[in-house]
Amino acid sequence: MTYLEALRTARVQSPQSYLYTTVARMHLGSVAAVCISILISSGRMTVKQLSSKAGIPVKTVKTTLVSLIQLRCVQYWREEGSGRVLYSFNEEGIWILLQSGEIINWIRCEYGEEEAEIIQNILEIGHIKVADYLTNFEDQKRHDREIILMRLYSDKWLRRLQPFNFNPLADIWEAKYEETIRSIPRTNTTSEIKRVTEAKEQTKRKIIDLFQSADDPNVVFTVKDGIKKLNPNITISFNLARFEKHLRSEALFHLAKYKVGTLTAKVYETALKLVEANSPDLNPQFLSISGWCADPEEVKSYKNSIENKLVDDRKITFGVRDVARALPEDLDLSCSILTHNFLKPTKRASDGANGAASKKVKLEDGESLDVFVENLEKNDSQSSSLILHHLKALCSGTNISFLHETSPSNFTIPYSALVDELKKHHYDLLIKITLGPNAFRVLRALKSLKLADEKALANAVLLKEKTLRNEIFNMVNLNIVEIQEVPRSADRAASKTFFLFRHKEQTAYNFLINSLTFGMAELLQGIVDFKDEHRILLAKCEREDVKGNEESLLLASELKTLKTLQEREMVSIARFSRLKALRQVFSA
């Protein structure tokens, strides 16, 4: 199978397959793209099966799979009886490749150049043993890198990698479940349903314990000369879930900025950063197991239980003082609107009045300075009071509760509820901007009515019948509105049938995710096609004698084509980033 054949197959199979195949082609080459396309379409396979289907030599396939496993794009599973090794696709590695530039830039801005260099090195090779990485440095430089690694691991940007991380989670579940169900004997007093339920619960506990063992502090850390360091024998990799939490925090900050204003949103951003590392994952990994949760309600309950446990353990709670300490120094809240609403103006004391209690502080040059302790305490209390009012506004200032107050002056962030509100907000804006205000009115009416016929909908939105039908037609084509047929007779005669309309959020979101994914793939494929079309010119520009001398060695037409290529690539990447950010919101 050639790359073009694999691309055509991926394009018609699913938007995700199209995107992943295109990304693999751009970053890893044609052979890797063909292997990934086949693994997505055919499921897990052996090396020989993959080689036969792809028409690629076994040796080349093995070499490619090693690289893909290293970069977490492929996982493997060894069967117990036959000993066969089966390979399957893992989308986590592709998403790391897609967001690697953004990840490095964020680490550079937040931490520094050396931290960004470490993350870049780990992203390039997938994972690395701590001892192997530190052998590249000597003495003080080595000590500095140990501190940086410890900091990045403590902030959860890095995670410990174990052998089971290379295995598909579904296969681990099946193996543990089979082991557990065999250990529970069949009895006359216990029903099969109860036996299976008990086996599932035990399997869940085993898998949770298995994954929690990766964070065992006795294994991960060592103490030398009173300094806590990472164990040099562990293997570390980048934690994609941590970056997804950062993206969620950014999205929530922008939503707060839109709803309550810039200054209050800045306070909220500080609060988000305080608990970001310990916040619940956007997509808990165990939910990918088919037997973990039975229905959507159970999934929702499971996510809420994770969040509630974090609140009970005080891992995602914070106080006013925590926010006050973490606020940026250049953020002046005294100019906010809340100042005049909640703080009384200070009375100007007369010159003859009794002054506030003062304290003598000795300076370096021997002179003393009167420090008015009472005034300092007043300023601190006023600052804390002002921050508290900003936090109160985030709790109940809008129709969205950005915070919940768990106890006086202590707050938590309701992530599950906020993610739902975030999706609704962005979806409503998309409908309003792309389809117009009339479609937005129809959508809001359907959300309110739940299920409505054309007449009830027309009365609710106050639109003409023809206009309403046009809007509904467009919205049905985009899976925003669903049609439900209601027959009035047993023979379901068309003349006696009427139709109801409804809006299902998850169905609409899934259609939007697929549309955004396909758009992302089309943009990347456009870049690839344009580069392939001018590959001779690009190869010429890569020559050592041409680099830096393009203007003197290239023709005017070639320079124009090169400029067009650069501009087109920049525009496509900018559009791609916007689509990716929007997809991230609805994928949570």
Curated annotation (Swiss-Prot):
Biological process according to GO: termination of RNA polymerase III transcription; transcription initiation at RNA polymerase III promoter; tRNA transcription by RNA polymerase III
Protein localization: Nucleus
GO cellular component, one term: RNA polymerase III complex
Keywords: DNA-directed RNA polymerase, Nucleus, Transcription, Zinc
InterPro entries: POLR3C_WHD, RNA_pol_III_RPC82-rel_HTH, RNA_pol_III_Rpc82_C, RPC3, WH-like_DNA-bd_sf, WH_DNA-bd_sf
Top-level taxon of origin: Eukaryota
Region Leucine-zipper, residue ranges: 516-537
One Gene Ontology MF term: DNA-directed RNA polymerase activity
Pfam families: HTH_9, POLR3C_WHD, RNA_pol_Rpc82, RPC3_helical
Family statement: Belongs to the RNA polymerase beta chain family.
Function: DNA-dependent RNA polymerase catalyzes the transcription of DNA into RNA using the four ribonucleoside triphosphates as substrates. Specific core component of RNA polymerase III which synthesizes small RNAs, such as 5S rRNA and tRNAs.
Subunit (UniProt): Component of the RNA polymerase III (Pol III) complex consisting of 17 subunits.
Protein name listed in UniProt: DNA-directed RNA polymerase III subunit RPC3
Gene name of the record: RPC82
